[in-house]
């Protein structure tokens, strides 16, 4: 079952925690690639100095953040790595959740090819498939073409995992500071990174 529009509404920190354990799905050339979300970061612009929308900054890149919740915000870092975010909060409130890491589930062969251009990989390479925001976008084939796409679409969405299959019973949710935001002054210390403690696909312990 796809997460309905209402799933993305409400407090961004709560939406971030609700995303843990759900499945991010991208259909590429008719083939399903997916992974269970195991690590996220919340960004609460315009008061959050780590957010692209801090101070109400509104640009062509950030415009989607000001729109309806439940849309994809994709951007590039270092000119080469894509990052995938879920827009949250009401229209006009530019907030979102960065998906930092996944446990790969569907389309494993396609994911391996996307990451390493081969299907025979080592155990270390397997653990490295989707344990970071740029890695998971490469693995799932998410690019700037997906910016602004509704997460109600057939090709890009979040699937709600049934309670009996949900991994939340196996892992404790831990909160801590977000990663690589040294520029963000006091916001550096906000405990808005949420992840499953001990999960092998978390990007940073």
UniProtKB/Swiss-Prot annotation:
Pfam families: Pur_DNA_glyco. It is an enzyme of class 3 (hydrolase). InterPro entries: Formyl_transferase-like_C_sf, MPG, MPG_sf. Its EC number is 3.2.2.-. Belongs to the DNA glycosylase MPG family. PANTHER family: DNA-3-METHYLADENINE GLYCOSYLASE (PTHR10429:SF0). This is Putative 3-methyladenine DNA glycosylase.
């Amino acid at each position: 079952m796809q997460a309905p529009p209402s799933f993305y509404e409400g407090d961004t920190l709560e939406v971030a925690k609700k995303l843990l354990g759900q499945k991010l799905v991208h259909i590429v050339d008719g083939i399903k690639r997916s992974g269970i979300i195991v690590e996220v970061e919340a960004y609460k612009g315009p008061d959050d100095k780590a957010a692209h929308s801090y101070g109400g900054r509104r640009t062509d890149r950030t415009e989607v953040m000001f729109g309806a919740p439940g849309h994809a915000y994709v951007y590039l870092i270092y000119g080469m790595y894509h990052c995938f975010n879920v827009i949250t909060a009401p229209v006009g409130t530019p907030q979102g959740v960065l998906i930092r890491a996944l446990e790969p589930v569907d389309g494993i062969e396609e994911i391996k090819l996307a990451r390493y251009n081969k299907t025979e990989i080592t155990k270390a390479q397997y653990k490295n498939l989707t344990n970071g925001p740029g890695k998971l976008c490469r693995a799932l084939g998410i690019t700037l073409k997906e910016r602004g796409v509704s997460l109600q679409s057939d090709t890009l969405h979040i699937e709600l995992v049934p309670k009996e299959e949900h991994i939340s019973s196996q892992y404790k949710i831990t909160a801590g500071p977000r990663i690589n935001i040294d520029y963000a002054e006091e916001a550096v210390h906000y405990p808005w990174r949420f992840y499953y403690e001990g999960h092998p696909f978390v990007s940073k312990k």
